[in-house]
Design a protein with these regions (language model features):
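Conserved nucleotide-sensing/catalytic segment adjacent to the nucleotide-binding pocket
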Residues: 34-91
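NTP-dependent small-molecule kinase module
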Residues: 2-6, 129-181
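The conserved Walker
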Residues: 17
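Hydrophobic anchor at the beta1->P-loop junction of P-loop NTPases
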Residues: 13
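Hydrophobic positions on the alpha1 helix immediately C-terminal to the Walker A/P-loop
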Residues: 24
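A glycine- and Lys/Arg-enriched "phosphate-lid" helix/loop adjacent to the NTP-binding pocket
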Residues: 88-138, 172, 180
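Conserved lysine of the Walker
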Residues: 21
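Walker A (P-loop) ATP-phosphate-binding motif of ABC ATPase nucleotide-binding domains
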Residues: 10
Length: 181
């Protein structure tokens, strides 16, 4: 791996719904040999379970936190070394949101999902309607990250296209314990 691997030990990935945070975070964590923390799987935002799970997961040494740590900034940001902002254009976010909603609408039912649940993806967080409703707000919010008091001294990397993000990830080199091709 090129670069200072210890700099990339504790990372938060942010971006609008549909930017590809989960997929990118999983790839980055694998590349760095770090734990991938998928915020949306830690429980309802702000719940006791969510707060306890976030605190426990960021106590580790190497992790990639997928999504902004709402309600837990005071715990997550002081431990963070790098914030990666996937700042993609509105049309890409909309296209990805529509594709995701279509996959979830016409694809196989998820465990515990009823037929009526299929259409909630169009208006749910991460769906195209929600993504467009919060696009400008989230971009402004993430644009203020450099001034967040909990992130003083933290490196903020901002990628404007998926190709720039992929090139940066490729430049990190091979995942630990894997043969270089």
């Amino acid at each position: 791996m090129t670069g200072d691997s210890e700099l990339f030990a504790r990372i938060v990935v942010v971006g609008c719904p549909g930017a590809g945070k989960t997929r990118f975070s999983a790839r980055l964590a694998r590349r760095l040999g770090a734990r991938h923390i998928e915020r949306d799987r830690l429980g309802a935002l702000g719940s006791k379970e969510f707060c306890a799970a976030v605190a426990a997961t960021v106590a580790g040494d190497r992790w990639v936190f997928d999504g902004p740590p709402y309600f837990m900034e005071a715990v997550v940001y002081p431990a963070t070394q790098v914030v990666i902002w996937l700042d993609y254009r509105r049309s890409l976010i909309l296209t990805r949101g529509i594709r995701r909603a279509l996959r979830r609408t016409i694809g196989p039912l998820e465990p515990g999902q009823s037929f009526g649940d299929r259409f909630r993806h169009w208006v749910a967080p991460g769906g195209p309607r929600f993504a467009m409703a919060v696009y400008t707000q989230r971009r402004q919010e993430f644009g203020r990250l450099r001034r967040h008091p909990g992130l003083a001294g933290v490196v903020v990397l901002r990628f404007g296209t998926p190709s720039a993000t992929a090139a940066w990830l490729a430049a990190l080199g091979s995942p630990p314990d894997s043969p270089a091709c």
